[in-house]
Amino acid sequence: MKLTKEQLAMLETPCVILDVAQARRNIEAMQAAADAAGCALRPHIKTHKMAVFARMQVEAGAQGITCAKVSEAETMAAGGLRDIFIAYPMVGAFRIRRALALAPKLDRLILAVDSWECARELSDAAQAEGLCLEVRLEIDTGAGRTGVPLEHAAALAQRIAAMPGLRLTGIYTFKGLIYQGAPTQDNILAAKEEGEMMAEAARSIRAAGVAIQDVSAGSSPTGVAVAQTGLVTEVRPGTYIFKDQML
């Protein structure tokens, strides 16, 4: 439905106007691309932060959703979402308590770690509650914000895998449009490098005796391309839902 000039003039500002039909087409296009590549899709909800859109994504075939913080995960759980990855290292006792309170309400909760200290705090909390928490180790593939450097990933993975109360099932990264350490507009090159770096991390961790399953990567600019490399098992794009010219 298109708004007339008269209807637009009557809107209170600031306001957000969403083309739901276009959003649904974007959801379906990204899902189709992931399916064609044989890669799971776990969209990030930080763009919309609305359970109604997250449910659309899951109904279209998404494996689950990704959140940036505990409060987003709480909102999504209240809205009926049951498979949630909080893709930011869980630091601070109050955040951990809230995350652990979510676990019984969900079919699957995945938490993030990127250091021994972060994992130790999670391990202690899980043991105190009698829980076994699924975790993923974040790999720094060039963004330089969070994550363990590639060369230290295997050693840290071994230590985390030995911690009681934790089950290390995978690795993840957020790289965005970075190639050889610098910003780029070439999403194909960025995606190829991202896939290769994550495949290398996975190989080194498995060679160290840690049997991870999930290798998760991809942003909206690189999501389709990194899925098509065949080097990752899951992609987590987010902004694609409202970017009507991206796909």
Q: Could you tell me what each predicted segment is?
A:
Residues M1-L18:
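Generic N-terminal amphipathic, Lys/Arg-enriched alpha-helix
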Residues M1-L3, Q22-F53, T66-A68:
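N-terminal glycine-rich anion-binding loops that anchor highly charged ligand groups
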Residues L18, D114, P237:
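A conserved hydrophobic position in a structured secondary element of the catalytic/binding core
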Residues L18-A21, I110, L189, E193:
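Short, surface-exposed alpha-helical recognition segments that flank or form part
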Residues A21-A29, E193, M197-E200:
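A non-catalytic, amphipathic alpha-helix used as a structural packing/dimerization or gating element
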Residues E28-Q31, L100, S123, R203:
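Generic structural signal for well-ordered alpha-helical scaffold segments
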Residues H44-Q180:
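Active-site-proximal beta-alpha core segment in soluble small-molecule metabolic enzymes
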Residues E134, T141-L247:
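Active-site loop/helix belt of alpha/beta enzymes
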